[in-house]
Amino acid sequence: LALTLPHVAHMPALAAKLDVLLFDIQGVGSAWYPFQYSMSWALEACALAGIPFIVLDRPNPLGGRVVEGPLLDPRGIFRHALPLRHGMTYGELATMWNQTEGYGADLTVIRMQGWRRGMPWDDTGLLWVMPSPNMGTLETALVYPGQCLFERMNVSEGRGTTKPFLMVGAPWVDAEKAAADLNGRGIPGAVFRPAHFIPRIDAGSPNPRGKPLNQMC
């Protein structure tokens, strides 16, 4: 059962061949992350097919007490308007959408034991297992809600390096001056240092925003 946008039209027919659909995917607490919308499509498909949908809930790595950032425009892969940092677990999102969108699915959320809304990931005792290739560390998840804004610009957000979303740059950016300026702003919990990198991306990949690919940033 493919959970990516080009395949969503076929989800109800595919779901009709199943007895139950179990969703067990780690989220990162950000509206940018596509798997929560995949869950929404799958939830609706199960409702249309008349089969149960079960979510094995997991902690929100960013915690559940802070909600911040603008709402994403619900279009394309972003099916619902969520703030950049939404403060919810996938089980909570599924429960909300099942009601607000009127899916009416036979939804069961297997709740976690021991997790509290104010609990940072480090306090869960869980190991970080990368939920997708560009989400390799907890630090990546922490900066992702803000750093992903650079993905919509003509700069590199670090994809194609070993530290995606932990670096940003372009050939026309003075790394030393940028780091000095940002450090001078005294942003709590953030330290910036100059870095130079080459984002290695297939030259044939779509590049509608004119990002610097395979060149020094």
Ranges and model annotations:
Residues I54-P74:
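Glycine-rich, charge-decorated loop segments at or immediately adjacent to ligand/cofactor-binding or catalytic sites
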Residues V20-V28, I54-D57:
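Short acidic catalytic loops
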Residues L48-P52:
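A short helix->loop->beta-strand "cap" motif at the edges of active sites that frequently abuts
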Residues G169-C217:
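Conserved functional hotspot residues or short segments at active or partner-binding sites
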Residues P74-Q147:
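Conserved anion/nucleotide-ligand pocket segment
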Residues L1-K17, S30:
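Glycine-rich oxoanion-binding loops at beta->alpha junctions
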Residues G27-M39:
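Glycine/threonine-rich flexible loop motifs
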Residues G146-G186:
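Oxyanion-binding "anion nests"
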